[in-house]
Design a protein with these regions (language model features):
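Surface-exposed, flexible loop/turn segments at secondary-structure boundaries
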Residues: 43, 97, 302
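Generic marker of residues within folded, mature protein domains
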Residues: 37-40, 79, 107, 286, ...
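Active-site nucleophile-adjacent alpha helix/oxyanion-hole segment immediately C-terminal to the catalytic cysteine
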Residues: 64-238, 242-253, 259-266, 271-294, ...
């Protein structure tokens, strides 16, 4: 009996303790729930505020002057390439031009080999320098005609048929720093030799350097199951190499005649048709609107050409301050500051109107130079109605428009050194004047 009584008391005590503990636990649980609910509410509110602030920041950060482009005409082109650390824009832009020509005519897409062209062209250029006893320039640069000459005389191969060797320093991009540091002194040593006669053995040595750094040009190769020589492959592309002409516009030679544009990289000295500026411009418009592209060579050293994919013929004297602040006088800004100001000003930037007289003045005083080669393939306009050429670059998928530049018509007309185009893209009335 006593045993059972003690047990009942113990049970009663345990029951009361259990109830007390349960009540305490319930209170703790409720308090925890309240705290968790409050924390969630605070986090949600904080998140909403952060989103609101982010949206506001984004809204504030949008530049109302940023160009918004509407395409007027866009012709098919091949993929964006990267010339990297090599002075081969002339090569990339012109091969890109011929790839677009093939695409237009045959609907086939090709990736033609730039280093095949370099290999052949640098050997030819070295031979000329030696023949001139060193009184000729030997450099990485070139002209659109160099590519056409190689296609006509040596042929071409697709990129896959000529693998690049050790020149790339472990990656897939061109790096001509070491290459030319080796090759230029070699060519100079032969060209400026004091010997009465020289042998042709030096060509074998130079060819070894070219092959080591650029890759060896194949004598034959297979492409899509068929064996070709480079000449046979070039013939199979469906183009007539005699269809291509070069156009320029200067007053120190008669209009509607040909002359070799006097720049150092035009070392083969081909003739370019000299036209009045307005007709030079009309050919570009006519070409693009009729499905053709244009291999353009010109000056991109101006502050109106940005690395973000925009080029405008800015009025530097008239644009003293793009913000209206006396602190930022345009002519005193650094190149980087000018680029930033241009980006900020966008479509509000005032442009100059190009003229024949200004083109000639800048050519004669070295302001207009042959800096770069690119491919014009389309026409677009911004929200103000200003028209631009759509231009493919060879600096990889860089800038605001992933390797494409929007270059105002005024900029292109003013800064053109010369360009290559299919003669069938020239308006009939101009062709008649040229007799082609």
């Amino acid at each position: 009996m006593d045993y059972h009584g003690k047990t009942d008391n113990n049970i009663a005590i345990k029951t009361r303790k259990k109830k007390l503990n349960n009540n305490i636990n319930k209170k703790r649980t409720n308090e925890m729930k309240k705290l968790l609910t409050l924390a969630v509410m605070m986090l949600t509110t904080s998140g909403m505020m952060a989103q609101t602030e982010t949206k506001a920041e984004k809204k504030d950060s949008v530049n109302p002057n940023k160009p918004v482009f509407t395409v007027i005409k866009e012709n098919p082109i091949t993929s964006i390439k990267n010339q990297a650390r090599s002075g081969t824009c002339w090569n990339y832009s012109t091969l890109s031009f011929f790839e677009a020509e093939i695409l237009k005519k045959t609907k086939k897409t090709y990736d033609l080999c730039e280093m095949f062209v370099c290999n052949k062209n640098y050997m030819d250029r070295a031979i000329v320098k030696v023949r001139m006893h060193g009184d000729a320039q030997f450099s990485q640069g070139g002209a659109a005609y160099d590519v056409l000459y190689v296609l006509k005389n040596y042929g071409i191969c697709p990129e896959e048929a000529m693998s690049a060797p050790g020149t790339m320093y472990g990656d897939t991009l061109n790096n001509f720093n070491e290459f030319f540091a080796v090759m230029e002194p070699y060519v100079d040593a032969v060209a400026k030799s004091s010997a009465r006669t020289i042998s042709t053995t030096w060509r074998n040595g130079l060819q070894g350097i070219l092959d080591a750094y650029l890759g060896k040009c194949p004598e034959t190769f297979k492409y899509e199951g068929k064996t070709y020589t480079p000449q046979q492959f070039a013939s199979s592309l469906g183009l007539n190499w005699d269809d291509y002409v070069t156009i320029t516009s200067y007053t120190h030679h008669p209009f509607y005649t040909q002359f070799a544009v006097e720049v150092q990289d035009n070392w083969r000295q081909p003739g370019s048709w000299n036209l009045p500026m307005d007709e030079m411009a009309a050919i570009i418009d006519n070409a693009v609107m009729n499905g053709y592209t244009v291999a353009w060579g010109g000056d991109v050293s101006e502050s109106g050409f940005t690395r973000e994919g925009l080029a405008l013929l800015i009025d530097e004297k008239g644009t003293q301050s793009l913000e209206g602040s006396d602190m930022a006088k345009w002519l005193k800004l650094t190149p980087k500051q000018k680029q930033d100001k241009l980006k900020e000003a966008g479509v509000t930037v005032k442009e100059l109107t190009p003229s024949q007289e200004q083109r000639q003045k800048e050519y004669d005083n070295w302001t207009l130079t042959d800096d770069h080669g690119m491919l014009i393939y389309g026409i677009a306009k911004d929200q103000t109605g200003r028209e631009y050429y759509m231009v493919k670059n060879s600096w990889g998928e860089t800038g605001e428009y992933k390797g494409i530049w929007y270059m105002s018509k005024n900029f292109i007309i003013a800064k053109t050194m010369d360009y290559m185009v299919n003669k069938n893209a020239i308006p009939k009335e101009i062709r008649k004047k040229l007799g082609i």
